[in-house]
């Protein structure tokens, strides 16, 4: 399963762990993803999305209807 946010499209990034001795080893920075259910009043049903914490703030700001309309316009929902 891909670790991708359904709303923002955030994906894992790559970087380095850096020790005190400045040794570098590769690592992945994973997005803070959570499965959340959102009640869509216009459709009278629950919608389950895998969203990042940034996407939760975006949904709080714009509303779930606007976010779903944007997802459908992109062909992702």
UniProtKB/Swiss-Prot annotation:
One of its GO terms (molecular function) is structural constituent of ribosome. The keyword Ribonucleoprotein applies. InterPro entries: Ribosomal_bL28, Ribosomal_bL28/bL31-like_sf, Ribosomal_bL28_bact-type, Ribosomal_bL28_sf. Keywords: Ribonucleoprotein, Ribosomal protein. The keyword Metal-binding does not apply. One of its GO terms (cellular component) is cytosolic large ribosomal subunit. GO terms for biological process: translation. Belongs to the bacterial ribosomal protein bL28 family. NCBIfam families: L28 (TIGR00009). This is Large ribosomal subunit protein bL28. It comes from Verminephrobacter eiseniae (strain EF01-2). The lineage of its organism: Bacteria, Pseudomonadati, Pseudomonadota, Betaproteobacteria, Burkholderiales. The gene is rpmB.
